[in-house]
């Protein structure tokens, strides 16, 4: 796919698609609750559609009509054995969280995904689930998909310290803990996104959170709810960066989720000197309107507890850093290596091929700015965030063309991305 290049300004206002993390969880909680759940503004990307289909395969009635998802919950013990293996597509969130959901189901399932998912380690989830009494295994010692799982009605509670900062592992264990008899204690390495905790309370569940320690008493019952999904800050991040680095630009992003566990990119933009305004804050929905303008940027250091708050935004932050004066250092981000691709290497290769100066490290990158970008051919390797990062980088290219291979990967999280880009170019 040939990308738009040499764009002189971006203007306009858009609503980004619904938050991917909240969309996944709304389907899961709605399915496990008793009674009806209605979900508004859900993301209809490929990953979320995979989760929706999996729960249909598990016997849950889910209707998508007039822009509203209606779920007839079956309760914590109401899932049915599927006729066939469960297809998770490209979605690491789906396979990990649903492994926890099925921990208390007394039937056997196989879960598989595409080529990319089949390279992602699941031992981070399988090891603690085995401690709870689940029979679960995959391929190689890292438990790569496909996974075979047989849950148990006699699920044991767990006391577990996460060796990595992972909201997916935490959430999988919370879903399992809801079905165990007794109190489970989950201790995070660093605080990660807390959508599962927030939504558990919304659906009538109970938990105790004390810093990095989460206690879930099981078993519990949940009750169907109305869920309004805010815009995804991970999708908004591409426009935040575009508005900062494309000259003569001003972008207004409406209804963006600003959950405090997800706003690391806002901290980074401010540390780099970017012009960013937050208005129309809704404290209940945890959403706001974000306004950015073209800015002169300076390098910064991104590390430690900040990393889990922006892990998915690091590819586009790397592009932002190529347009800042000085050096930006990203470290403590080894988790990037086991995303849809090895995002440390793939980001560095993609942007360096366009003229950036990025040195990959074991746990991050060293980025020297400011770089003039030129044309190149870039492969997403099936990673949606690499595709969108490259499309934003291409806007700065004055010399040559930018070809993007496997651009369809963007449909994973943002099917209307190129439509929104066109509207901002012509705004």
From Swiss-Prot:
The keyword Cytoplasm applies. Pfam families: EPSP_synthase. Phosphoenolpyruvate binds at residues 20, 92, 120, 168, 343, 385. CDD domains: EPT-like. GO terms for molecular function: 3-phosphoshikimate 1-carboxyvinyltransferase activity. It catalyses: 3-phosphoshikimate + phosphoenolpyruvate = 5-O-(1-carboxyvinyl)-3-phosphoshikimate + phosphate. It comes from the Bacteria. Its main location: cytoplasm. The active site is at residue 312. It is an enzyme of class 2 (transferase). It is found in: Cytoplasm. Pathway: Metabolic intermediate biosynthesis; chorismate biosynthesis; chorismate from D-erythrose 4-phosphate and phosphoenolpyruvate: step 6/7. GO terms for biological process: amino acid biosynthetic process; aromatic amino acid family biosynthetic process; chorismate biosynthetic process. Keywords: Amino-acid biosynthesis, Aromatic amino acid biosynthesis, Cytoplasm, Transferase. 3-phosphoshikimate binds at residues 20-21, 25, 166, 168, 312, 339. Its EC number is 2.5.1.19. GO terms for cellular component: cytoplasm. HAMAP family: EPSP_synth. Belongs to the EPSP synthase family. Monomer. Catalyzes the transfer of the enolpyruvyl moiety of phosphoenolpyruvate (PEP) to the 5-hydroxyl of shikimate-3-phosphate (S3P) to produce enolpyruvyl shikimate-3-phosphate and inorganic phosphate. This is 3-phosphoshikimate 1-carboxyvinyltransferase.
